[in-house]
């Protein structure tokens, strides 16, 4: 089960705990208090996506890599001996500096399907709760989750809205990568759109990027030392990787296999 699958399984148990409380107290007030408690325990849920602060692209010498049916450039050398592919959908790219990139491929609508399975709700009810477009793609559902904050659950909210928004706040708090504490940024390329969790200016130990297309998503985790002589990974270097991602057509993959 993927990380999001495990996350959503936790959410499935919320309903029973809420039912007893609701017998004695008002719905909206209870959910407003609960949402603010989540915000106090997990301050990251108060963050929402903003535009990327640096769109420059590193021009440093590097390499073009090809894994899992995709190719992209990195502005660094690669340690081929330590680079490993632990499964059919992920690869760990080792860099001579000691840093690494975890690259993985995600099937279409994995997040949406996990939500439907874990919440035990049917698609029609979720569409009524969150809107027609919410379950259209993993990108649209992720965007919905990231845009919600505890402040959107008010004491005078309609019961259905309060329940739905609180559920999103809880999902957001549990699913958020550690890097998201320093910022959440929108990502756009020619073929993908998604989000970056983490501001490289704060030199986090890890920084995640998720990008989505109609035929599935890609995830990059940039891992680095948080101190020492190795230069920190910069936004321009991350942009070099993300902005050069492209899917390799099947015909091209076949042709490469013949050479």
Label every PLM stretch briefly:
Residues 128-215:
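Signature of long, low-cysteine stretches enriched in small and polar/charged residues
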Residues 87, 92-162:
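Surface-exposed acidic loop/strand-edge motifs in secreted or periplasmic proteins
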Residues 2-115, 122-123, 204, 215-216, ...:
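N-terminal targeting sequences that direct proteins away from the cytosol to non-cytosolic compartments
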């Amino acid at each position: 089960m993927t990380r999001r699958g495990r996350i959503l399984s936790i959410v499935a148990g919320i309903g029973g705990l809420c039912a007893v409380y609701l017998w004695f107290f008002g719905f909206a007030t209870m959910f407003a208090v609960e949402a603010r408690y989540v915000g106090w325990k997990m301050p990251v849920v108060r963050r929402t996506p903003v535009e990327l602060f640096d769109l420059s692209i590193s021009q440093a010498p590097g390499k073009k890599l090809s894994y899992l049916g995709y190719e992209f450039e990195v502005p660094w050398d690669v340690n081929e001996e330590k680079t490993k592919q632990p499964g059919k959908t992920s690869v760990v790219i080792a860099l001579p500096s000691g840093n690494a990139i975890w690259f993985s491929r995600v099937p279409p609508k994995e997040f949406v399907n996990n939500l439907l399975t874990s919440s035990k709700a049917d698609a029609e009810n979720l569409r009524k709760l969150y809107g027609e477009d919410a379950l259209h793609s993993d990108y649209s559902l992720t965007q919905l989750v990231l845009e919600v904050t505890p402040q959107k659950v008010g004491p005078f909210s309609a019961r259905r809205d309060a329940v739905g928004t609180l559920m999103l706040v809880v999902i957001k708090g549990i699913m958020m990568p550690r890097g998201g504490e320093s910022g959440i940024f929108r990502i756009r390329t020619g073929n993908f759109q998604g989000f970056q969790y983490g501001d490289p200016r704060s030199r986090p130990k890890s920084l995640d990027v998720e990008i989505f297309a109609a035929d599935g998503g890609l995830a990059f985790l940039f891992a680095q030392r948080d101190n020492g002589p190795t230069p920190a990974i910069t936004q321009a270097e991350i942009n070099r990787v993300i902005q050069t991602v492209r899917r390799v057509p099947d015909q091209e993959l076949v042709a490469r296999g013949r050479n």
